[in-house]
């Protein structure tokens, strides 16, 4: 009898632990450690379980529009990597708070309000994906490692479950956005949602379009365009560039080992650019432990996100992850989409709007390569190359294509929106409102 009682108690305790870490938990966060006073916006955090057994627990941050959440667009924002936490988007790129940049003294870093949050005109879901990123985790060992196409399916499942629990947003115009490596996943996700709306999944998601910043599209092409970009930005000489064009014939990545002359020239190019910060070429290449380094904010974020009180406030499941890492590049991952261009083509044919933007000082994914794959779609122009303005100042350049695709540069911008927050916000606000840039 005693043994039966003990067994029953242990079973109940196990069940309680399971339920406490079970899927589809959501909590309202009214304050955050490091931020002075109550949050001036509505924040919800939680997990949505995906997979056959809901073994994958995807963590999200949801911030309601500060204007009119009942009618404003709903945006899903993904960070790149793969393996970079969506906290990158929330704290640096387009969210309503940021880490205060000050020398770390052993106490919790502070958070401050931002001026140009995209939540002024849209509600945003920031999602940690793939599993193993940020606060997302798996309750069991995965049978298959994450992949580009697999993530499109998982995120689609996440969205249906999230909207099922937030039905008040099911009729809002829905958009997907992200930058960097998300250029491989988001076009496939848009296609997955579009197909699901017709084939399997009710109610349909009110998908209207997508926005991508400095998006990866095809790895070899993206890298090959770094050479003409470096030449245009005076990082390599005319002579070296002309020699590379002639001998390498435009192929600078995965060079044929028999082409020793090309390999030598590529080596010369690398000597000229190895100390360049490719994310924003006008900033120093530096280590994040130096307070003078731009990336110091990432170190402060690591201290903040690993604090027990912060994780408690965010309602992170205790013990679900080890150390929080902003970008975990060691996630086992299958890069099974070699080019996202066909997905862009299909999404345009299906009538979805898209804005592709490039910081013109990004060398990770140079705007030259982005323009090249857009040209390959052979869309007719409806508004040719022109400056877009903020007040009387040029903020960048833009052109608009048929099939609802627009391209824009951000003058002086880098790999992500964080480097030019005002310009990025105004660009987004105009596009999401249906206005010309």
Curated annotation (Swiss-Prot):
Q: Does the keyword Transcription apply?
A: no
Residues making up the signal peptide according to the UniProt record: 1-25
Q: Where is the active site?
A: 180, 362, 415
Gene Ontology BP, a term: proteolysis
Give GO MF terms, alphabetically. serine-type carboxypeptidase activity
Tissue specificity here reads:
Ubiquitous.
Listed A to Z, the keywords are: Carboxypeptidase, Disulfide bond, Glycoprotein, Hydrolase, Protease, Secreted, Signal
Its main subcellular localisation, reduced to a broad class, is secreted
- Any one annotated GO CC term: extracellular region
Cysteine pairs forming cystine bridges in this chain are 84-327, 248-262, 286-293
Give the EC number(s) listed in the UniProt record.
Answer: 3.4.16.-
Name of this chain's protein: Serine carboxypeptidase-like 7
**Organism annotation:** Arabidopsis thaliana (Mouse-ear cress)
């Amino acid at each position: 009898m005693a043994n039966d009682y003990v067994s029953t108690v242990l079973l109940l305790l196990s069940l309680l632990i399971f339920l406490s870490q079970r899927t589809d938990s959501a909590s309202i966060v009214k304050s955050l450690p490091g931020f002075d006073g109550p949050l001036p916006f509505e924040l919800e955090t939680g997990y949505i379980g995906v997979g056959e057994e809901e073994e994958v627990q995807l963590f999200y941050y949801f911030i309601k529009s500060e204007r009119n959440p009942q009618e404003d667009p709903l945006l899903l924002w993904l960070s790149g990597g793969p393996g970079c936490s969506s906290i990158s988007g929330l704290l640096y790129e387009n969210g309503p708070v940021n880490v205060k940049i000050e020398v770390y003294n052993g106490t919790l870093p502070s958070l401050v309000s931002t001026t140009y949050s995209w939540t002024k005109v849209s509600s945003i879901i920031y999602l940690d994906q793939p599993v193993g990123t940020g606060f997302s985790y798996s309750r069991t060992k995965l049978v298959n490692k994450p992949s580009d196409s697999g993530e499109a399916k998982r995120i689609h499942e996440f969205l249906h479950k999230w909207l099922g629990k937030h039905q008040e947003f099911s009729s809002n115009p829905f958009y997907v956005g992200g930058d960097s490596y998300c250029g491989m996943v988001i076009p496939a996700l848009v296609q997955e949602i579009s197909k699901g709306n017709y084939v399997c999944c009710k109610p349909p998601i009110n998908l209207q379009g997508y926005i991508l910043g400095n998006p990866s599209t095809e790895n070899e092409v993206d890298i090959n365009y770094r050479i003409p970009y470096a030449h245009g930005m005076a990082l390599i000489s005319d002579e070296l560039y002309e020699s590379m064009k002639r001998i390498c014939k435009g192929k600078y990545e995965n060079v044929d080992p028999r082409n020793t002359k090309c390999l030598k020239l590529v080596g010369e190019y690398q000597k000229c650019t190895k100390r360049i910060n490719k994310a924003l070429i006008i900033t120093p290449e530096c280590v994040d432990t130096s307070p003078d380094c731009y990336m110091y904010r990432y170190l402060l974020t690591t201290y903040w996100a690993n604090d027990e009180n912060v994780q408690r406030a965010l309602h992170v499941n205790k013990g679900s992850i080890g150390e929080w890492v902003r970008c975990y590049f060691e996630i086992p991952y299958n890069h099974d989409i070699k080019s996202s261009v066909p997905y862009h083509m299909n999404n345009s044919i299906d009538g979805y709007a898209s804005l592709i933007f490039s910081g013109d000082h990004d060398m990770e994914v140079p705007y030259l390569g982005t323009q090249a794959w857009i040209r390959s779609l052979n869309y007719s122009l409806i508004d040719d190359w022109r400056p877009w303005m903020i007040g009387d100042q040029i903020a960048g350049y833009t052109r608009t294509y048929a099939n609802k695709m627009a391209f824009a540069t951000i003058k002086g911008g880098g790999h992500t929106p964080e480097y030019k927050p005002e310009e990025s916000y105004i660009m987004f606000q105009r596009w999401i409102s249906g206005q010309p840039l």
